[in-house]
Amino acid sequence: LMSDTAGKNQAITAGVDDALRLGCAAIGFTIYPGSDAGLEMFEEISAMRAEAAAKGVATVIWSYPRGEAVTKDGETAIDVCAYSAHIAALLGAHIIKVKLSTDHLMQPEARKVYEDRGIDIATQAARVRHCVQASFAGRRIIVFSGGAAKGEDAVYDDARAIRDGGGNGSIIGRNSFQRSRPEALAM
């Protein structure tokens, strides 16, 4: 448990050698763009990614906007989510996981650019496409979190939007595990 005033951060609990010992093909790391601890996290994953690359291990980065510089609506705003995906790509991720975004634009400066350049964010597929573009124009694998448990139709709609937008997959853990086994398997 941490206080509400503590910066959003993650603890490193294992290293690259631990991943190799366990037979893992990749290391994983969560960053929180927008957190006061963000730069520290970027430095930590940069060092771990370099070590992993030297040892032939891929890197997965969960890039979830949150923290002191991000509003609650901003955590899923398209400008913030696309930038978070881009940050993960810049940090060397082979695989990037981000949240599906809304059409909300958190940053006033970004709103002007999106409007002036006519960047399409009207549909979920368009927003996925924008996040893929932000991840080195599709030269990184980008998967999207499934979010809170929801109805089957909503899960399928998200999966179709990810497919249509050029994303590489949807992680639907809660949408599977919070159902009965027969329901989850049928889905």
Where do the PLM segments sit?
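Alpha/beta enzyme core
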Residues: 1-142, 153-169
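Residues in flexible loops and secondary-structure boundaries
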Residues: 106, 150, 184-185
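C-terminal helical cap(s) of enzyme catalytic domains, especially alpha/beta-barrels
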Residues: 163-166, 177-187
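Short Gly/Pro-enriched loop/turn and capping motifs at secondary-structure junctions
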Residues: 103, 147-152, 176-178
